[in-house]
From Swiss-Prot:
InterPro entries: Cystatin_dom, Cystatin_sf
Cystine pairs: 86-97, 107-128
Family note: Belongs to the cystatin family.
Species of provenance: Cyanea capillata (Lion's mane jellyfish)
Name the UniProt record assigns to this protein: Cystatin J
A GO CC annotation given for this chain: nematocyst
Known function: This recombinant protein inhibits the C1 cysteine protease papain (Ki is below 0.5 nM).
Site (Reactive site): 22
Locations listed in the record: Secreted; Nematocyst
Motif annotated as Secondary area of contact, chain positions: 68-72
Keywords on record: Disulfide bond, Nematocyst, Protease inhibitor, Secreted, Signal, Thiol protease inhibitor
TM region(s), chain numbering: none
Domain Cystatin: 35-109
């Protein structure tokens, strides 16, 4: 009954962005740019992908994202990644290397954020395609 009333209230006041538990909601461009949990999660996902694939990619654009309330927040983000022009050297900081602009990769990262656990972010899935 409570869920029915919540849905009815959301529909009656025209709230397209009403986030119900379990409901998947597409994030606006403004939300994507300002959501610290999402942006930190994207960094986490890219770092994990780089570690797993021995790559040196950096996120250059969050194309789209969705969020779902579960036991935490489940995010799915479509990210454009570009390689850095650096030799694989642990002494070289990736942020100082120039971007290689002609080889974008698009990845869909799904990760979970749970503020109450020690490891706040966990990867659920990764799918990447070189453009």
């Amino acid at each position: 009954m409570h869920l029915y009333l919540c849905v009815l209230v959301c529909l009656s006041i025209g709230m397209a962005n009403c986030l119900l538990p379990g409901g998947i909601r597409r994030m606006t461009d403004e939300e994507i740019q300002n959501d610290e949990i999402l942006l930190t999660g994207v960094e986490f996902a890219v770092d994990k992908y780089n570690s797993d694939t021995n790559s040196r990619l950096i996120a250059t654009n969050v194309i789209s994202a969705t969020v779902q309330v579960v036991a935490g927040f489940k995010y799915n983000a479509l990210i454009e990644l570009r390689p850095r022009l650096c030799v694989q050297d642990p002494k070289t900081k990736i942020a100082t290397c120039p971007l290689r602009m002609n080889l974008p990769t698009k990845c869909s990262f799904t990760f979970l954020y749970q503020s109450w656990v020690p490891q706040k972010y966990s990867m659920l899935s990764t799918k990447c395609l070189r453009a």
